[in-house]
From Swiss-Prot:
The keyword Membrane applies. It is a multi-pass membrane protein. Keywords: Antiport, Cell inner membrane, Cell membrane, Ion transport, Membrane, Sodium, Sodium transport, Transmembrane, Transmembrane helix, Transport. It is found in: Cell inner membrane. The chain crosses the membrane at residues 23-43, 63-83, 97-117, 120-140, 144-164, 202-222, 238-258, 303-323, 357-377, 391-411, 447-467, 475-495. GO terms for molecular function: sodium:proton antiporter activity. The gene is nhaB. This is Na(+)/H(+) antiporter NhaB. GO terms for cellular component: plasma membrane. NCBIfam families: NhaB, PRK09547.1. Na(+)/H(+) antiporter that extrudes sodium in exchange for external protons. It catalyses: 2 Na(+)(in) + 3 H(+)(out) = 2 Na(+)(out) + 3 H(+)(in). Belongs to the NhaB Na(+)/H(+) (TC 2.A.34) antiporter family.
């Protein structure tokens, strides 16, 4: 017997999501207008909490759908306007270009990356050394590339590793579905679970590595560039001014990487199963035997494009997204990828997240229109100069862990600059606050996927369900890093930032905003 119209509509609404999740979203959509009529400020914070809930439940339903419904309702009931949403999207166009083109550009360099990381994986047997290598590599790359780009690289490598073993374990060859474990016998499943744990730990080490490296340079994160422009700093100035905080944090972050692997804490310490190593070794041997001169030329071309990518980003020759577009054009033209459908596959990973980030900008518009952060900013600026550094750092960290760190950094640096221009704080204090804002925005935000766009990208990627990386597990695995990075950063802001900056200024190393 065919189901009723109502039942059919309920099943279609958010598809396979659990009934309790669908019901929760309906409750949100029903109560929001009434709360907004009663108290817009409370309604604004409630909307932020609801959006965070949809992100936390990313594996139940992709957040674009429920988050998008909440955003549409927010515009309809007047929490913000469509014009303001457009302004936020326009202001963050370079971030969207980055997602659309840079992430897709990396897709066409996967052969080279898989080759390099396979050699790295097979040549380093110590899990601690391998984890450290992934963390250091991610940190170094993130100093020149955006963290999203680096995470996209590591995701593509991990999916490649996983796919190689899953094909062997399922005995289904090229027709293998990586999400389907039904054809894998119990023995292989045990090994597969261990392999998942191994990949989870590598992904988290690499993800945190992007935060460690990304905070150090003005091109490491989008908000870094905004803060550098506001303070009038160039590449070298930015690096030196951040170094009293970022260098100790980097050292302690790498020590944390070694400690959690050694002690097998927080889900770390899983080693690469020998059976998987053998499969990957065989794959590598076969790949090398089958590699034709044409294939070798492709690898060389991809390596040259990689050099162009790092050089263009380091010298900031163009916007990051446009450099990514140049990578797509060069990589496809010089490696013979000419079919539209083959090129289209490169965009399947990044475009859903681009749409999700656009939805997020509408939530940002609500935050601005409802002045949700105003009480916090007023409270901080009323404190003493020394306390301001600590408070800016802590409030940036708190808000960045639940909100977009680009937005938080932008709001705070604009408020700090306005305070300087109005005479509320000195130029010297503003420059110290800029460091506190940048480090506070970047370091504590590793606590949750909400704060780091790279973490959110990982959580909502095709890899997350393969290696069973949920929101809760990601928060748990990030916890030791969150504690160490936040505390060391706070201590450095409190005790080393001002004297180290004063010393570098007297030595003539630092430029000052005129």
């Amino acid at each position: 017997m065919e189901i009723s119209w109502g039942r059919a509509m309920w099943r279609n609404f958010l598809g396979q999501s659990p009934d309790w999740y669908k019901l929760a979203l309906l409750v949100f959509l029903i109560v929001n207008p009434f709360i907004f009529l009663a108290n817009p400020f409370i309604a604004g914070w409630l909307l932020v909490a609801e959006f965070i809930f949809t992100l936390a439940m990313a594996l139940k339903c992709y957040p674009l759908l429920p988050g998008g419904l909440l955003a549409i309702e927010a515009v309809i009931i007047g929490m913000t306007s469509a014009a303001h949403v457009r302004e936020e999207v326009a202001a963050n166009l370079e971030v969207l270009l980055l997602l659309m083109f840079m992430v897709a550009g990396i897709y066409f360099m996967k052969q080279l990356l898989l080759f390099i990381f396979t050699r790295l994986l097979l040549s380093i047997r110590s899990k601690m050394v391998l984890s450290l290598a992934f963390c250091v590599a991610a940190a170094f790359l993130s100093a020149f590339l955006d963290a999203l780009t680096v995470v996209a690289v590591v995701i593509s490598v991990a999916v490649g590793f996983y796919g190689i073993y899953h094909r062997v374990a399922s005995s289904r060859g090229e027709e293998n579905d990586m999400l389907d474990d039904s054809h894998i016998d119990p023995h292989y499943k045990t090994v597969l679970e261990q392999f998942r744990g191994f990949l989870r730990s590598l992904m988290m080490h690499a993800g945190v590595g992007t935060a460690l490296g990304g905070v150090m340079t003005m091109v490491g994160e989008p908000q870094n560039l905004i803060i550098a422009k506001a303070a009038g700093w160039h590449f070298g100035d930015f690096f030196l001014r951040m170094s009293p905080v970022t260098v100790p944090v980097l050292v302690c972050g790498l020590l944390t990487c070694m400690l959690v692997e050694k002690m097998r804490w927080f889900g770390y310490g899983e080693t690469l199963p020998e059976k998987v190593r053998d499969v990957l070794q065989q794959f590598d041997d076969q790949s090398r035997k089958k590699r034709t001169r044409q294939d070798k030329i492709k690898l060389i071309v991809q390596a040259i494009i990689g050099v162009w990518l790092v050089t263009a980003l380091a010298l900031h020759l163009a916007e990051v997204g446009l450099i990514g577009l140049s990578v797509i054009i060069l990589a496809t033209a010089l490696t013979g990828v000419t079919d539209e459908h083959a090129i289209g596959k490169a965009f399947t990973e990044s475009l859903p997240f681009t749409a999700l980030l656009t939805v997020f900008f509408s939530i940002v518009a609500v935050i601005i229109d409802q002045h949700l952060f105003a009480p916090i900013i007023q409270f901080v600026l009323q404190a003493s100069e020394h306390a301001q550094l600590t408070l800016f750092y802590l409030f940036n960290g708190l808000l960045s862990s639940i909100s977009d760190n680009v937005f938080v950094g932008t709001i705070y640096i604009n408020e700090a600059k306005a305070a300087m221009e109005n005479g509320a704080i000195s130029l010297k204090q503003f420059e110290l606050l800029a460091v506190a804002i940048n480090t506070g925005t970047n370091l504590p935000s590793v606590a949750t996927p909400n704060g780091q766009a790279a973490f959110l990208f990982l959580l909502t990627s095709a890899l997350a369900p393969l290696i069973r990386l949920s929101y809760g597990r990601m928060v748990w695995m990030a916890l030791p890093y969150t504690i160490v990075l936040t505390l060391i950063g706070l201590l450095c802001v409190e005790f080393t930032l001002a004297p180290a900056t004063e010393w570098m200024t007297q030595a003539g190393w630092l430029a000052t905003l005129s």
